Regions:
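Substrate/cofactor-recognition hotspot
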Residues: 99, 106-110
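Residues at alpha-helix boundaries and the short loops/turns that link adjacent helices
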Residues: 16-19, 73, 87, 103-106
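Short amphipathic alpha-helical surface patches that mediate protein-protein
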Residues: 81, 98-101, 117
Length: 126
């Protein structure tokens, strides 16, 4: 493992998803899934998210579209929160999800809208 890349990824991951969430994910890792946590932190967050070509906001917007297309509601929920942290507005999220309906199918967009509404309601309670 590239320790510097891992640490850079850990910093971005915590800044986007929240320190508590990331620390819980790492702390709850066991011998089976710890390599995945390390891989995700080093490569997804370290090698990709730290690149200079796109700002975090744009990367978050891309992730919302891709996770909707892949029908991954658990990951979408997490990245919706991260997108808001990275400056994506609820209006921009709505537009992203509307566009996924055209290119990924209405059922994918319906599920993504449902997930977004759950996230917004959860955040509005705080």
């Amino acid at each position: 493992m590239d320790k510097a890349l891992y640490e850079a990824g850990l910093e971005v991951r915590k800044a986007t998803l929240g320190k508590e969430f990331v620390e819980n994910a790492i702390a709850s890792a066991d011998d089976f899934n710890r390599p995945l946590q390390e891989f995700v932190t080093e490569y997804c967050w370290g090698a990709c998210w730290t690149r200079p070509g796109l700002p975090r906001k744009t990367r978050s917007m891309l992730n919302l579209a891709m996770l909707t297309a892949l029908n991954r509601p658990h990951e979408l929920k997490m990245h919706l929160k991260g997108a808001l942290t990275n400056g994506v507005t609820r209006e921009e999220i709505r537009e992203i999800l509307l566009q996924t309906g055209v290119y990924c199918g209405v059922p994918a967009a319906v599920d993504a809208f449902r997930t977004a509404k759950e996230v917004f309601a959860e955040l509005d309670k705080k």
